[in-house]
Structures are given as structure tokens and as C-alpha cells.
Amino acid sequence: MINVIGVRFRTAGKIYFFSPGQFAVKQGDHVIVETARGVEYGRVVSGPKEVSDDSVVQPLKSVIRIATDEDKRTVEENHQKEKEAFKICQEKIRKHDLDMKLIDAEYTFDNNKVLFYFTADGRIDFRELVKDLAAVFRTRIELRQIGVRDETKIRGGLGICGRPLCCSTYLTEFAAVSIKMAKEQNLSLNPTKISGVCGRLMCCLTNEEETYEVLNSQLPSVGDMVTTSDGLTGVVQSLSVLRCLLYTSDAA
């Protein structure tokens, strides 16, 4: 067994495991850790807890330090720099007449890299853009193409339910969603009713999928002939799956 903490770097972002090392880290603390992208600032969202050795990627990195007030100021300064970097990158995109939509700019905590997230319909040759950006920021530049679901996760917003989007508040990963889920839940197949802000099928269709699968397996299908315990016979016309009710017409 190994002692770990779970750290998240973005709201609703993936959780990564680190060793607390010599520090008495608790949930809610902010820590400085070394990642594949460099030194980063993150929030402890779980642990410390004991997990099996094979459940984490080895070797496990240790916490460098618990974040100080100076570290927090660095994060705020980076956020301000990101706004300026976003504007500059947009200008460079227009200069090179590239068919791409800039979504976000992000500085790593140690300022060793600036990441720009964008969407585009196809592949983009942004080599000259990267050269221009590197000349301006004098640090490593990474342009990362993302999909419409990731774009919506970054931008946030409200769903048709009136609540903040699931993807930008608590979903750490996107699950596969299919039209079959909407059919099993007897939902309207009108695309405007079952599509999210991103234009894809709503992620929340997966929330009750398992429940509907179990209940549907216990109920007859529309059109089936059924006989009740008191001997009445009829043809199933419609179902109320969650209430486990079915509506029939006289078999005659």
C-alpha cells in the first residue's frame, strides 16, 4: 500500500495522484508539484489515503511544498498574463490568416510554457504562428487542438435545465453517449431537446442509463400481449419506466 493525495489543476479537471511526502497535507490545501508539463499549482481534492501500489502510475512524484502566499500571487499574475497572451495570439492568427478559433491561453505555474487551445475543422499548419509567438513570449509554446466538448468544458455555461454545465462543474472525463440512451429513456429524439451547448448529445443522458437498462429488462415492450394476475389480457400501448407502469388496450 502507498499513501497518496489527489490533486486537481483545473475545475472539473482530471485528478492526479502524488505522494504527500513529509508534508501534513489535507483536503482543500493548495500544493506545488512536479508534472509532465513542469512545476504546477494544484488543489488537493482527496486524501491522504492508502491505495494499492498497482493503482497508481509509478514512480509517484512527491509534493514539493504546500503553496505559500507568494505562490498564490504568482497564480493570479499568470491569470492576468494569460489574458494578454490570448489577445496577442488572436492578433497573430489574423496576421497569418489561419482558419482556427482560439479558445483559451494558459501559463504553466513556472512560466516555462504557454499553452494555447484552439478548435478547427481540419489540420492547421501553425509552424509560422509558433515562431511568432515564441519570439514574443520567449518561452516554450504549445498549440493544442481540442474538440467542441472540450471547448464547452473550458468556456462553461448553462444547460437547458438552467443549471451550470455538468462538464464544467464536476465531470472529469467524457463518457460515450448514444442515441440509444435517449430511446431507452423514452425521450424526444428532436436534436434540439437532447443536444447540449456543444451540439453533441447531452452528457446527462448517461446519468440514468443504468437504471433504465435494469427497469426496461423487467418490463414488456410496446406491442407485447400481457396478462395480469387477475386474468385481464391486453396489448401494451405505452410504458412509464421509472414508475414501473404500463398502459394497455383491450386485446379484443
Question: Where are each of the predicted segments found?
Answer:
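Acidic-enriched and Gly/Ser
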Residues: 1-188
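Short aromatic-glycine-enriched beta-strand elements
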Residues: 3-5, 243-246
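A short, compositionally biased micro-patch
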Residues: 10, 136, 229, 239-240
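Short conserved beta-strand and strand-loop elements enriched in small hydrophobics
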Residues: 29-34, 223-229
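Short beta-strand-centered aromatic/proline hotspots
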Residues: 41-46, 233-239
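Short, conserved beta-turn/loop elements at beta-strand boundaries and strand-helix junctions
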Residues: 48-51, 239-243
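Conserved glycine-centered short motifs in functionally critical loops
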Residues: 157-228, 234-237
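Conserved small/polar residues in nucleotide/adenosyl-binding loops
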Residues: 247-252
